[in-house]
């Protein structure tokens, strides 16, 4: 005779529904000015988590008043941003560094940025709390457009277009100016590089007397010892020091070409 089999009750589980606790309700009932003063003293690394508390918190975290208060309190803070461009998707994915509540540590958290601009083959560079998205490929066409992501509010605004349409170029910052090199359809000494003055919001060409020996497309670049070092897809390297307006060929093999990790801090 077989042993009796006990009927097991099927245990069902459901996703927990987050409801406001008395403590969180009390916090949300505080005056807006006081909430902003409190949030201004919290690290930006905690903002992605706090934005999940409620729509009110999400709105406060993206408000101009909060960042004005942080500035007055001397609590301005830079954060790490990651942008992923997927060839099959027109819209890029944006992430920012977030502190993990449990266990300790950090994680890249996805952030929602409405009306995000395409970043395929564009030049991304951070200046203060802004990330400039310069040129690139839009429907397989070179572009001269420039847009700016304000990392405080995660909103976009337009900036003056470049003088030349560019694709697969490089962008670097020195002394408050953005230098954009390569990527034009027809490279010559007068259009291989141009510079954007952030204060005056104007573009000007930078004459490159050795443009004929430079690659049209740029693969890697970095600012090293006051000079912009650029490497094309053919491995040809060139360095430009804007402070003394000096160009120099740096050969086909250089430690810059051995591999780099790209980060944006804004």
UniProtKB/Swiss-Prot annotation:
Q: Which residues cross the membrane?
A: none
The UniProt entry, under Gene3D superfamilies, shows: Kelch-type beta propeller (2.120.10.80)
Residues forming the F-box domain are 24-70
Where are Kelch repeat segments found?
130-176, 178-223, 226-266
Keywords from UniProt, A to Z, are: Kelch repeat, Repeat
The record, for InterPro entries, names: F-box-like_dom_sf, F-box/kelch-repeat_ARATH, F-box_dom, Kelch-typ_b-propeller, Kelch_1
SUPFAM superfamilies according to UniProt: F-box domain, Kelch motif
What the entry lists under CDD domains is as follows: F-box_AtAFR-like
- What is the protein name for this chain? F-box/kelch-repeat protein At4g39560
Organism field: Arabidopsis thaliana (Mouse-ear cress)
